[in-house]
Amino acid sequence: MECIIKLPQRFNKNKSKKNPLRIFDSTVLNHQPDHIPQEFVWPDHEKPSKNVPILQVPVIDLAGFLSNDPLLVSEAERLVSEAAKKHGFFLVTNHGVDERLLSTAHKLMDTFFKSPNYEKLKAQRKVGETTGYASSFVGRFKENLPWKETLSFSFSPTEKSENYSQTVKNYISKTMGDGYKDFGSVYQEYAETMSNLSLKIMELLGMSLGIKREHFREFFEDNESIFRLNYYPKCKQPDLVLGTGPHCDPTSLTILQQDQVSGLQVFVDNQWQSIPPIPQALVVNIGDTLMALTNGIYKSCLHRAVVNGETTRKTLAFFLCPKVDKVVKPPSELEGERAYPDFTWSMFLEFTMKHYRADMNTLEEFTNWLKNKGSF
């Protein structure tokens, strides 16, 4: 997840007041005769590596865990604990998500991202918000622009009000019109499904830490999360650009659906390693907020997305977040010497949206920011 609106002074060298690019249009940029525009070229030490090794991540049989078979539960706890303590990434299979929903949600992305620019801009994200269409970060920065487009939605399982409104479906209908009715229905169902799945994974994470099974589930039952479609167009010089720059997710838990185009890389053991797509498996990773909730026991790891020279890559990401006023504090069983202060998700979200570009030090910089503000 990348959240960039405003940066501290020491990061403002990336701020662009007179960026000549108005919108990210990969079709136009790829047909320029000379080279990729400099705005999208990353520094040499951050450019994609060749011959990246494959990261060995455990595959968790979620159905086995949910069966309550003692042996299967114990094995799932062991695998997830080992991964979460080292790098925070693992795969889940037999997760119960309908294959037709996964397939339809992936295919429907083209309905939006292959639309004319004027159509996509109907949903343009407003400054300071997490919802809407973002065209790289054109117009906001002049360096290290990601080679991607995104469409993001806010979601909460408690969002149904007296008139049974549904935020994902209604947002799409309001911004894009009735022609996107099926589009909205599918992604509303997708967000609801991933929210439910994330709560099951939270049960596993809680048990693997030796705390009550329901502790994290109950903490996130009224979550206020973010659901995002990531569209990484092919690039004629993929060795110069990044689809998403190196960062740790500031959120709690990410569930990522990859397509069959590899692109996810994680920085482990001082090198970039890839997590190639596995059919029907979903990638799960720990975010900064969950790292704070576990008092630093489980890790949020640096990762990035690279792009392909031959084909477009599409992913769907559900970022589980607490209700904005929930206090992020480890359970008593994990407290000991505190690694991070108490904070609310709204405070951390404000920091990542207004003050800091997410990277590997976001949580530490946030802690320092709180100290300087005298918030604790």
Curated annotation (Swiss-Prot):
InterPro entries (alphabetical): DIOX_N, IPNS-like_FE2OG_OXY, IPNS-like_sf, Iron_ascorbate_oxido_reductase, Oxoglu/Fe-dep_dioxygenase_dom
Induction notes from the record: Not controlled by the level of physiologically active gibberellin or by auxin. Up-regulated by paclobutrazol.
Gene3D superfamilies per UniProt: B-lactam Antibiotic, Isopenicillin N Synthase, Chain
Cofactor(s) listed: Fe(2+); L-ascorbate
MF GO annotations: gibberellin 20-oxidase activity; metal ion binding
Fe2OG dioxygenase domain residues: 222-322
Positions contributing to Fe cation binding: 247, 249, 303
Catalysis performed (reactions): gibberellin A12 + 2 2-oxoglutarate + 3 O2 + H(+) = gibberellin A9 + 2 succinate + 3 CO2 + 2 H2O; gibberellin A53 + 2 2-oxoglutarate + 3 O2 + H(+) = gibberellin A20 + 2 succinate + 3 CO2 + 2 H2O
Enzyme Commission number: 1.14.11.-
Alphabetical keyword list: Iron, Metal-binding, Oxidoreductase
Protein name: Gibberellin 20 oxidase 4
Organism: Arabidopsis thaliana
Lineage: Eukaryota, Viridiplantae, Streptophyta, Embryophyta, Tracheophyta
This protein's encoding gene: GA20OX4
